[in-house]
Regions:
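Surface-exposed, interaction-prone regions used to assemble/regulate multi-protein complexes
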Residues: 1-129
Length: 129
């Protein structure tokens, strides 16, 4: 599968702000300091979306990956499993949904549903032994 987006962030000066609806997830991620064997690099917000950026230790380029949510989104993360596939998610008016990244569940609870899911990075599956 082709990688639809792959990028490395070297600029550490990018300014991010948060808003009330994301306060809980911001505090949670900051308290962990470790996001699925990676590090949270940024939690950003603009008029249209919220971005959680993190680096994964398995990536030799230490590429930053983004989860992008549009709208009022609350996340509950299953941190017991490792994220190997990262998706970009666009949410618009709707209901509660569950999204799985290679078996890692992220529950999105909001007045939004997924409008578009675009695979950014795929994990090659090992053949059965």
């Amino acid at each position: 599968m082709k990688k639809t987006e792959f990028y490395t962030v070297r600029d550490k000066t990018t300014q991010f702000t948060t808003y009330d609806d994301m306060a809980e997830i911001v505090a949670y991620l900051e308290s962990k300091g470790n996001f699925h064997d990676g590090t949270v690099e940024a939690i950003g917000h603009d008029e249209e979306s919220t971005t959680i950026g993190f680096k994964h230790y398995s990536d030799p380029e230490y590429t930053i990956h983004r989860l992008i949510f549009t709208g009022n989104v609350e996340l509950r993360l299953n941190v017991d499993l490792l994220v190997r596939s990262i998706y970009e998610i666009q949410c618009e008016t709707g209901e509660r949904v569950n999204v799985f990244f290679n078996g890692v569940g992220i529950e999105i609870t909001a007045s939004h549903v997924i409008l578009r899911v675009q695979e950014l990075i795929t994990q090659e599956k090992s053949p059965p032994s």
